[in-house]
C-alpha cells in the first residue's frame, strides 16, 4: 500500500467514476454527479483563497478567545480542537452546562492546526484538549501528506499540550462511506485503508504518550468497515445520530483524562 496521499483532480475523477459503478454504492444520474462535482470543486477553490489570506485561520476565534475569561477556580475546562467534525458538533445540546470550548474549523489539516494551537488551545488554559484530526490530511486539503507527515504533526500537537500541563484525548479518525451521491465524491480522497492505518498509529501513540484514546471508528463502522449510512448523509460528517454515538464516548474519555490532571 502506498503511503503517499495524492490530491490529483484526474485521480479523483477516475475514482469517482469507478465508484459510481460499484454495486454497493447508490446509483447517481449524470446530472446529479455533475452538480455534486461542481459543488466540490467550488468549495476547494474557496479553500485556496482562505489558505492564501490566513493559512491557520487565526482570525476565526480571535474575538471569542479575547472575550473568554480565564478558568475559574476549580473549573475543568476542556477544549475540543479539530476540523469540521468538531466545528459542527452541537455542543449546546450535547454537553449542556459543561465548561467545554469548541475550537474546530471546517476543512482544516493538522498543518493548519499547528499554526493556531497556541492561540486556540494553550492560551485558553484547559485541563484537557480533545484532538480530532487527520481526515483532511488524508484528503490532501493543503497538499499531499504522507502518513508519517500526519503522525509527526499530531505528535507535535500532543507534545505542545503536555509541555503546558494539558491532558490529551486523542480521537480516532472517523470512517467514511460511499452510499450517497455526495459521499461518492468524498470517498476516493479518504481511502479506508489509510484511515485504518492512521487509527492504528493513533491508538499506539496515545498509549505511548500517556494520552487517552477515544475510538469512534469501531462503533460507527458497518460490516464493510465503512461509516454506517445512517450516521452521515454525505459519507463524512456525522448527523444527529452520529454525534449521539460520539458524545458519550467523548465524555468517558474526558473523565479518564481528568482523573490524571
Predicted regions and their residues:
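Oxyanion-hole/transition-state-stabilizing segment in secreted/luminal serine hydrolases
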Residues: 80-81, 86-105, 110-153, 175-180
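Charged, glycine-enriched surface loops/patches
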Residues: 147-171, 201, 205-211
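N-terminal secretory targeting modules
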Residues: 1-79, 87, 91, 124, ...
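Short, basic/glycine-rich phosphate-binding loops at helix/coil junctions
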Residues: 37-48, 94-100, 132-133, 226-227
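Loop/turn elements at helix/coil->beta-strand transitions in domains of secreted/extracellular proteins
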Residues: 75-77, 98-99, 125-129, 163-169, ...
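Active-site segments of SGNH/GDSL-like serine hydrolases
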Residues: 132-138, 158-195
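Extracytoplasmic/secreted envelope proteins and their assembly/folding machinery
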Residues: 114, 118, 147, 151-158, ...
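Catalytic His-Asp segment of secreted/periplasmic serine-dependent ester chemistry enzymes
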Residues: 174-261
Amino acid at each position: 500500500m502506498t503511503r503517499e496521499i495524492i490530491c490529483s483532480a484526474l485521480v479523483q475523477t477516475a475514482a469517482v467514476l469507478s465508484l459510481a459503478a460499484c454495486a454497493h454504492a447508490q446509483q447517481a444520474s449524470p446530472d446529479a454527479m455533475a452538480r455534486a462535482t461542481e459543488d466540490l470543486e467550488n468549495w476547494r477553490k474557496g479553500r485556496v483563497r482562505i489558505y492564501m489570506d490566513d493559512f491557520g485561520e487565526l482570525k476565526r476565534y480571535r474575538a471569542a478567545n479575547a472575550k473568554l475569561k480565564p478558568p475559574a477556580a476549580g473549573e475543568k475546562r476542556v477544549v475540543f480542537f479539530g476540523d469540521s467534525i468538531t466545528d459542527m458538533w452541537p455542543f449546546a445540546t450535547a454537553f449542556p452546562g459543561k465548561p467545554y470550548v469548541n475550537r474546530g474549523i471546517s476543512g482544516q489539516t493538522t498543518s493548519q492546526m499547528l499554526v493556531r494551537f497556541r492561540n486556540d488551545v494553550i492560551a485558553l488554559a484547559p485541563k484537557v484538549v480533545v484532538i480530532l484530526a487527520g481526515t483532511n490530511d488524508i484528503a490532501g486539503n493543503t497538499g499531499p501528506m504522507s502518513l508519517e507527515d500526519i503522525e509527526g504533526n499530531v505528535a507535535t500537537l500532543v507534545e505542545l499540550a503536555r509541555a503546558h500541563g494539558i491532558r490529551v484525548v486523542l480521537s480516532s479518525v472517523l470512517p467514511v462511506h460511499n452510499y450517497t451521491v455526495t459521499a461518492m465524491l468524498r470517498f476516493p480522497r479518504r481511502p479506508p485503508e489509510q484511515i485504518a492505518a492512521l487509527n492504528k498509529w493513533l491508538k499506539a501513540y496515545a498509549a505511548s504518550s500517556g494520552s487517552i484514546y477515544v475510538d469512534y471508528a469501531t462503533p460507527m463502522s458497518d460490516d464493510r468497515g465503512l461509516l454506517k449510512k445512517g450516521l452521515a448523509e454525505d459519507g463524512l460528517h456525522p448527523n444527529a445520530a452520529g454525534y449521539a454515538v460520539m458524545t458519550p464516548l467523548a465524555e468517558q474519555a474526558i473523565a479518564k483524562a481528568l482523573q490524571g490532571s
